[in-house]
Amino acid sequence: MKKLSALIPALLFMTVFTVNAAWEQPTLGYTLSPLSKPVEAPNFKLEDMDENEYDFSEYRGKVVLLNFWATWCPPCKREMPSMERVYQKYQGDNFTVIGVNQMEDGDRIFSFTGSLDTRPTFDILLDSESKVSQAYEVRGLPTTYLIDKQGKIRYRAIGGREFDHQEVEKIIQSLMNE
């Protein structure tokens, strides 16, 4: 009985912590803010975790969901699965997703993506000096831009989103049909 009474506070703490941890998860929205006037997306060259270089200009002709994120960012982690789902759904239709990680190394990103239920298959690029995020005027993470086939930024979202929500998918389909 003495062992059980000593165990009860620990079990109570673990239960309360688990419930509160789930309760405190950031909610994800689904709205994207249209830019009043589309602007040219800044071009950049970045490497992925395997040191392969990507030139953003090579994505011209595709609708691009460009997401700035970091492993320490809870809403970034929460929105990753929805980015993968929308990528899988539309990738063959002139659409792609690019994740631009902020100031973290490839080993940390590899470990993080490996811990997710579904490992992302879209391109993840490293902005180790945060120069690309500065060019895109990123002020908080996650920040996402939806770029049309002509390379113009058309929509922006600051904070976590469910990118496979039907409202977001309508926007993506609309841009793909232009």
Segments from the language model and where they lie:
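Thiol-/selenol-based redox modules, centered on thioredoxin-like
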Residues: L146-E178
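N-proximal helix/coil linker or "cap" segments that precede and/or mark the start of modular domains
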Residues: V19-N43
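Bacterial N-terminal signal peptides that target proteins for export
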Residues: M1-I8
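Short, internal strand/loop/helix patches
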Residues: I98, F110-Q150
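Conserved redox-active cysteine motifs that mediate thiol-disulfide chemistry
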Residues: R60, F68-R85
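A short beta-strand-turn-helix
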Residues: P38, N43-V64
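Bacterial N-terminal signal peptides
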Residues: I8-V16
